[in-house]
From Swiss-Prot:
The species this protein was found in: Pyrococcus furiosus (strain ATCC 43587 / DSM 3638 / JCM 8422 / Vc1)
Assembly mode: Part of the 30S ribosomal subunit.
PANTHER family attached to this UniProt entry: 40S RIBOSOMAL PROTEIN S29
Amino acids binding Zn(2+): 21, 24, 39, 42
Disulfides per UniProt: none
Protein known as: Small ribosomal subunit protein uS14
GO cellular component: cytosolic small ribosomal subunit
Similarity field: Belongs to the universal ribosomal protein uS14 family. Zinc-binding uS14 subfamily.
Gene: rps14
Taxonomic placement: Archaea, Methanobacteriati, Methanobacteriota, Thermococci, Thermococcales
Length: 56
């Protein structure tokens, strides 16, 4: 095997590295409600525009 073969990675199918935020590209805490695919930071910024309300 050549050295170039070691640098290729197969795409992840599960885990934190499998999904990324469609707004900022961050991996990690992803909100997938109704297919949003937003990280929690972006979700907090965009949630009122999407119609989500915060109840006390």
């Amino acid at each position: 095997m050549a050295k170039a073969d070691y640098n290729k990675r197969k795409p992840r199918k599960f885990g934190k590295g499998a999904r990324r935020c469609i707004r900022c590209g961050q991996y990690g805490p992803i909100i997938r409600i109704q297919g949003l695919m937003l990280c929690r930071h972006c979700f907090r910024e965009v949630a009122p525009k999407l119609g989500f309300r915060k109840y006390e």
